[in-house]
């Protein structure tokens, strides 16, 4: 009672209430009521972010392995339907992971699949090799995207090495596990990866967290890949 929507033609009172429930009060207050998020309440400080210049690194070197991960965000509300495709370049000599690509945008499942396969082609053109492993979430009905990705990959002759991932641990705990990697410079970013950095700096209070979720997935895949291979010199 007593509530008045300033622009009812854009969002109804019901829409706003639903958004507040699905996105959380802190994210809603920041996005819709212009109440800024307190950085002290977030898990990642912008001062922790360390950067690299792609022009200064030879990603064609044999020591690099590439790990990808997709958070498709299928079935979520229309206001939070970003999908994230993160590609990490792991330097197996130093153990440092470079965020080679951070693609976070709104798109339909068919476009997600097409973009993943295009990144495989781009890796092969620019580095001489494709993904060592690519993780795709299979929670709930997201499994169908992984299956379709495999079929389309084979159809196009790419044969992407796909690993289905069913997440059972709380997302907040998973993303929080990135803290020491980011803080200690074990994960390096490009300065132009602004949306990923923004989502990290606002986690867990921001409206969107698809980028951090996919980053954690790629990081975890890379660690498992290293443990399963006869590599030396990894410092974590």
Model-derived regions, located:
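ATPase catalytic-site recognition across NTP-hydrolyzing enzymes
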Residues: 1-72
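Mg2+-dependent endonuclease catalytic cores in nucleic-acid-processing enzymes, primarily RNase H-like
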Residues: 1-9, 14-18, 35, 39-43, ...
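Helicase-core coupling region on the C-terminal RecA-like lobe
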Residues: 31-39, 211, 219, 235-236
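An active-site-proximal beta-strand-loop segment
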Residues: 70-83
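Generic detector of well-ordered alpha-helical packing
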Residues: 72, 138, 210-211
């Amino acid at each position: 009672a007593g509530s008045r929507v300033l622009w009812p033609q854009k969002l109804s009172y019901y829409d706003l209430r639903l958004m507040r429930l699905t996105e959380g009060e802190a994210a809603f207050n920041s996005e819709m009521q212009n109440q800024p998020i307190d950085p002290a309440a977030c898990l990642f400080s912008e001062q922790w972010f360390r950067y690299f210049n792609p022009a200064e690194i030879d990603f064609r070197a044999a020591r690099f392995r590439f790990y990808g991960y997709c958070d498709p965000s299928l079935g979520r509300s229309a206001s939070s339907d970003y999908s994230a495709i993160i590609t990490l370049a792991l330097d197996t000599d130093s153990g440092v992971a470079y965020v080679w690509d951070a693609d976070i945008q709104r798109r339909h499942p068919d476009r997600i699949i097409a973009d993943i396969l295009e990144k495989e082609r781009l890796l092969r053109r620019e580095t001489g090799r494709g993904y060592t492993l690519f993780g795709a979430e299979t929670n709930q009905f997201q499994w169908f995207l992984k299956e379709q990705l495999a079929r389309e990959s084979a159809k196009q002759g790419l044969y992407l090495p796909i690993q289905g991932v069913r997440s059972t641990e709380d997302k907040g705990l998973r993303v929080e596990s990135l803290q020491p990697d980011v803080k200690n410079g074990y994960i390096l970013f490009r300065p132009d990866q602004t949306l990923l950095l923004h989502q990290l700096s606002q986690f867990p209070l921001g409206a969107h967290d698809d980028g951090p979720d996919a980053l954690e997935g790629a990081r975890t895949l890379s660690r498992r890949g290293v443990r399963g291979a006869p590599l030396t010199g990894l410092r974590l």
